[in-house]
């Protein structure tokens, strides 16, 4: 806070000049900071610290800059938020100029990311909630893309920037520090790696379709309740390299074809092949009729059983909640995977299908799995009856009943045969070469050709897809590096020098002057330092993870020792009781013998 105050004089003058600019109409109120009562820090945004506060007897969120380098992002967010007014975009109440801060609507439900992957207890949510969140997100982004005279592109769509209110039923987009006006040429790399469109970090020109790619990743994330590309691990540029090579999140078993087609179209390598946000809104609005109950508040579990504590929270409602009780037996027969030796989608062996069908029918009603920050390969084995994602086969049947789309054939999936719901081109899953293992841990990425199919032989319930693209195509970059610069075949440090994109705003290198060798040299040095920084941070994270594992093992050992000690004491106590009972038994036996002898004497005398 003190840093923000120190920077307020210069920041307020720039903000004041921007406010007074006659060419811009900004709809916000200049607020006196004395009217604000700060309560607590709740997080960080694209810039600055976000605090909960009271202003005019209502809860608000204030965002303050911490350094001079964040002033530009502050002005961007102030300018963009002052232009928008939509129920699915966080409302700007006003701004303070001394110290510099934004006063915005407070979201009591926190971010969607925390709802999906936060600390326990995690809330239950249904398929209707997941679809509603994505619909509301698309409505907000479609509004940004359709603004006049200049449309807006968010460029940083991800669950941490999606806030929930009204019991988790209403979603609001926030964090416009990276937003910009839609232009013909935009090469500034903004956003986060897991949700970032490939054309953004490749340095080529990109458009509003980069938001569509991010939305498609979010759709996958809320359905599976798993972090995208989490199985890759390591620094963020590993994700970038995998996405650049065509890797996408694994398809979801039993996902209705219209939803799967929409999702995979959003992941297309070619931005022109992705649907517009307006089209997404129309499709999602149509599909929402099959998902009632989105207006019910999220429910948090009061307590967990032993199993619940080990497996984290799950969703009470899934796509299977709308289906009949025998859906799991029926749906598992349609499970598909991509073999490691070719690109044809085949059925699993009948024995595996029968076993999984039996196990899943015994497991009862399954639901959205909770995130544990784990990869696809860390899912529970099939013998536990757990699925990676929700069962949506009955919803698919309902959609089929009303739209009468043709049944998909075996082999390559026909993603465009959905009647009148989706009039889209066919998504081609290509691949002529043999996929090979790379050194990136827990991930099978594509080979040297971007169009090859990537598969995960140890995950029969999912199939990894890649989008096709010209194999000779090389991305245009805004700096002198290209993927061909890499001499490391292990996909490590030199694979893709874009690590600085995921650093905090104040740590990212400034764009160099292409005509200055010194500027380019400084930029290259800064990027290498950023790469080294990311490597060190990764090592720290791995060491911390190992530390947590050791602490957990130590706790388990202590519990085992306590249990052993308790068992020894119980055994000793039982031995004492046994000895006491034996003594008592002998006494009773002697007394019985005495009584019998006395009775015999009496009978003899009589």
Swiss-Prot record:
It is an enzyme of class 2 (transferase). The modification Phosphothreonine is found at residues 184, 187. GO terms for biological process: apoptotic process; defense response to bacterium; I-kappaB phosphorylation; immune response; inflammatory response; interleukin-1-mediated signaling pathway; interleukin-17A-mediated signaling pathway; interleukin-33-mediated signaling pathway. Residues 301-338, 354-391, 443-493 are annotated as: Disordered. One of its GO terms (molecular function) is receptor tyrosine kinase binding. Residues 361-375, 453-463 have a biased composition (Low complexity). It is a peripheral membrane protein. The keyword Endoplasmic reticulum does not apply. Keywords: Apoptosis, ATP-binding, Cell membrane, Cytoplasm, Isopeptide bond, Kinase, Magnesium, Membrane, Metal-binding, Nucleotide-binding, Phosphoprotein, Serine/threonine-protein kinase, Stress response, Transcription, Transcription regulation, Transferase, Ubl conjugation. Its cofactor is Mg(2+). The modification Phosphoserine is found at residues 192, 367, 389, 439, 455. Residues 36-291 form the Protein kinase domain. SUPFAM superfamilies: Protein kinase-like (PK-like). The active site is at residue 156. Activated by pro-inflammatory cytokines and in response to physical and chemical stresses, including osmotic stress, oxidative stress, arsenic and ultraviolet light irradiation. Activated by 'Lys-63'-linked polyubiquitination and by autophosphorylation. Association with TAB1/MAP3K7IP1 and TAB2/MAP3K7IP2 promotes activation through autophosphorylation, whereas PPM1B/PP2CB, PP2A and PPP6C dephosphorylation leads to inactivation. Ceramides are also able to activate MAP3K7/TAK1. ATP binds at residues 42-50, 63. It comes from the Eukaryota. Residues 306-338, 443-452, 464-473 have a biased composition (Polar residues). SMART domains: S_TKc. GO terms for cellular component: ATAC complex; cytosol; plasma membrane. InterPro entries: Kinase-like_dom_sf, MAP3K7, Prot_kinase_dom, Protein_kinase_ATP_BS, Ser-Thr/Tyr_kinase_cat_dom, Ser/Thr_kinase_AS. PANTHER family: MITOGEN-ACTIVATED PROTEIN KINASE KINASE KINASE 7. Serine/threonine kinase which acts as an essential component of the MAP kinase signal transduction pathway. Plays an important role in the cascades of cellular responses evoked by changes in the environment. Mediates signal transduction of TRAF6, various cytokines including interleukin-1 (IL-1), transforming growth factor-beta (TGFB), TGFB-related factors like BMP2 and BMP4, toll-like receptors (TLR), tumor necrosis factor receptor CD40 and B-cell receptor (BCR). Belongs to the protein kinase superfamily. STE Ser/Thr protein kinase family. MAP kinase kinase kinase subfamily. Can form homodimer. Binds both upstream activators and downstream substrates in multimolecular complexes. Interacts with TAB1/MAP3K7IP1, TAB2/MAP3K7IP2 and TAB3/MAP3K7IP3. Identified in the TRIKA2 complex composed of MAP3K7/TAK1, TAB1/MAP3K7IP1 and TAB2/MAP3K7IP2. Interacts with PPM1L and PPM1B/PP2CB. Interaction with PP2A and PPP6C leads to its repressed activity. Interacts with TRAF6 and TAB1/MAP3K7IP1; during IL-1 signaling. Interacts with TAOK1 and TAOK2; interaction with TAOK2 interferes with MAP3K7 interaction with IKKA, thus preventing NF-kappa-B activation. This is Mitogen-activated protein kinase kinase kinase 7. It comes from Pongo abelii (Sumatran orangutan). The lineage of its organism: Eukaryota, Metazoa, Chordata, Craniata, Vertebrata. The gene is MAP3K7.
């Amino acid at each position: 806070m003190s840093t923000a105050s120190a920077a307020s004089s210069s920041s307020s003058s720039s903000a004041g000049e921007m406010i007074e600019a006659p060419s811009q109409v900004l709809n916000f109120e200049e607020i006196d900071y004395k009217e604000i009562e700060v309560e607590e820090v709740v997080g960080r945004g694209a810039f600055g610290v976000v605090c909960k506060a009271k202003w005019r007897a209502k809860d608000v969120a204030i965002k303050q800059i911490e350094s001079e380098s964040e002033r530009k992002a502050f002005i961007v967010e102030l300018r963009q938020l002052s232009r928008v007014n939509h129920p699915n975009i966080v409302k700007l109440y006003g701004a303070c100029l001394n110290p510099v801060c934004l006063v915005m609507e407070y979201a009591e439900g926190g971010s969607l990311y925390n709802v999906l992957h936060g600390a326990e207890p995690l809330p239950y949510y249904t398929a209707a909630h997941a679809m509603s969140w994505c619909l509301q997100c698309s409505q907000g982004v479609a509004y940004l893309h359709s603004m006049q005279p200049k449309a807006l592109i968010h460029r940083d769509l991800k669950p941490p920037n999606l806030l929930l209110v009204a019991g988790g039923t209403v979603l609001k987009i926030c964090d416009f520090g990276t937003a910009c006006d839609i232009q013909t040429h935009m090469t500034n790399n903004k956003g986060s790696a897991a949700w970032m469109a490939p054309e953004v970090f490749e340095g080529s020109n990109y458009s509003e379709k980069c938001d569509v790619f991010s939305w498609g990743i979010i759709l996958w994330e809320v359905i599976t309740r798993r972090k995208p590309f989490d199985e890759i691990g390591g620094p963020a540029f590993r994700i970038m390299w995998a996405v650049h090579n065509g890797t996408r999140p694994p398809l979801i078993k039993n996902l209705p074809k219209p939803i799967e087609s929409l999702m995979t179209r959003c992941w297309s390598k070619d931005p022109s092949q992705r649907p517009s946000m307006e089209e997404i809104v129309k499709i999602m609005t149509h599909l929402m009729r099959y998902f009632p109950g989105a207006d019910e508040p999220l429910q948090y579990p009061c307590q967990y059983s032993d199993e619940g504590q080990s497996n984290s929270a799950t969703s009470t409602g899934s796509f299977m909640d709308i289906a009949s009780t025998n859906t799991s037996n029926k749906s598992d027969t349609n499970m598909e995977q991509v073999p490691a030796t070719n690109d044809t989608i085949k059925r699993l062996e009948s024995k595996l299908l029968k076993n999984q069908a039996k196990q899943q029918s015994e497991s009862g009603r399954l639901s959205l799995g909770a995130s544990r920050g784990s990869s696809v390969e860390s899912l529970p084995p099939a013998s536990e009856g757990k699925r990676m994602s929700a069962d949506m086969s009955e919803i698919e049947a309902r959609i089929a009943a009303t739209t009468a789309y043709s049944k998909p054939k075996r082999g390559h999936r026909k993603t465009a045969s959905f009647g009148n719901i989706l009039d889209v081109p066919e998504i081609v899953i290509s691949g002529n070469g043999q996929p090979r293992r790379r050194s990136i841990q827990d991930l099978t990425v594509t080979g040297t050709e971007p169009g090859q199919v990537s598969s995960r032989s140890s995950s029969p319930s999912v199939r990894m897809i890649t989008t096709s693209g010209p194999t000779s195509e090389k991305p245009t970059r805004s700096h002198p590096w290209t993927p061909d610069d890499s001499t490391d075949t292990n996909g490590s440090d030199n694979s893709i020098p874009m690590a600085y994109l995921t650093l905090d705003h104040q740590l990212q290198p400034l764009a160099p002057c292409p005509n200055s060798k010194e500027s380019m040299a400084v930029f290259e040095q800064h990027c290498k330092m950023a790469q080294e920084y990311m490597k060190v941070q990764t090592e720290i994270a791995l060491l911390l993870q190992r530390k947590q594992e050791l602490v957990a093992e130590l706790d388990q050992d202590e519990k085992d020792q306590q249990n052993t000690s308790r068992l020894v004491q119980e055994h000793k106590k039982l031995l004492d009781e046994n000895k006491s009972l034996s003594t008592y038994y002998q006494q009773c036996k002697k007394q019985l013998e005495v009584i019998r002898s006395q009775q015999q004497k009496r009978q003899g005398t009589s």
